[in-house]
Amino acid sequence: MIKTIAFDLWGCLLKENDYPMSEQEEILEKQFWNLNDDEEYFAWATKTLSLSEEQIKAILTPIWEKLYSLREQSIFEKILKKYPNIDFAIATNHISDVKNSLKHLWISERCKTILISWDCGYEKPSKEFYELLIKRIWHNAEEILFIDDQEENIQNAENFGLKAIYYQKNTILSETILSYLSKIE
């Protein structure tokens, strides 16, 4: 029985909106995926833009608030209507400051566990990332449904005993999840 659904953020739970970014925002956003941790990111950003870390964070906040939104506004409610005892978690590779996005979208209030690679020091698809996810959720691996849009992440999650769904963007996420859950009941 699934007790927790762990979502990847980008490409699964969140979608990217058409938001015209400033030159500074574009520079900062493009590097989200190219560096390994907060220290490296902010060292690069402060050097590149000649701004303080606080100024960089002030530029990032509008990016979280305008560029990203929930792929499906009522996804949590739809799942909880059918499975009221399920918990939610986030498992993402990203800069720690992404927490601002989660607050803006009320995701942090809905998710019991939030695991961000740059916070914990491990990235998907590493063994350590999945071990830490399981440890923080406090359920057995087979009680966790992991959803991601990267096949390698899905494969490794399954290798560590998690149930997993490879999410494809042309489908409705809640329907994909509910269909999967109904099949394994």
Task: Annotate each predicted stretch with a short phrase.
Residues 78-83, 95-98, 112:
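Short basic alpha-helical hairpin corresponding to helix-turn-helix/winged-helix-like nucleic-acid-binding
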Residues 1-5, 95, 102-185:
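Asp-based, Mg2+/Mn2+-dependent phosphohydrolase catalytic module
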